[in-house]
Amino acid sequence: MSFIKTFSGKHFYYDKINKDDIVINDIAVSLSNICRFAGHLSHFYSVAQHAVLCSQLVPQEFAFEALMHDATEAYCQDIPAPLKRLLPDYKRMEEKIDAVIREKYGLPPVMSTPVKYADLIMLATERRDLGLDDGSFWPVLEGIPATEMFNVIPLAPGHAYGMFMERFNDLSELRKCA
C-alpha cells in the first residue's frame, strides 16, 4: 500500500482514501510549509497564506470554499499548473482527494466560479507583489486584475499556519450559524 505519514501521525493511503485520515491540522501544517511557485521566489510564500488571502476576495458565502480550495496540496504538494497539465495520472489522484475533502467539509463537488476567479486574481496579485512580473505574457491572466485590497507580504510558515487556522475556525463558526 502507498501511504504518507501526516503531521498528526495518521497514515494517508493514496490507494484507499479515507476521509477520517483527513485532518484540518494536517492540512494547515502542510500548506503553511509548502512554498508557492515551486519555490522560485526571493522569499518563502506559503500555500496557506495564499488560501487565506483568496478567502478574503470572495463574497462571504464562498469564503470557506476559497480557504480550502488548495487543501489537496497537503497530500499532493503544489505542482505548477503547466507541469500538472502534463501529468494526467497525478491530476486524477488530485481529483479523487479533492472529492473526499469536499465531501468531508461540505463543499460543492466542483469549485465555484467565484473561487476560481479569486484564485486567478491572487495569481495576478502574487505576480505583481512577489517579483514575478518580468513583462512576459501570462495567457491565464489575460483580463484578470490584481487586487487593490492588499499587497502580498510573505509570512513565515508558523504565522501562515496561525492565520489559516484562525480563518478556518472563524469561517466554520459562521457556517454553523447559517
Swiss-Prot record:
Gene3D superfamilies in the cross-refs: Hypothetical protein af1432 (1.10.3210.10)
SUPFAM superfamilies listed in its UniProt record: HD-domain/PDEase-like (SSF109604)
Domain of life the protein comes from: Bacteria
UniProt GO MF annotations: 5'-deoxynucleotidase activity; cobalt ion binding
Protein name: Uncharacterized protein YfdR
Protein source organism: Escherichia coli (strain K12)
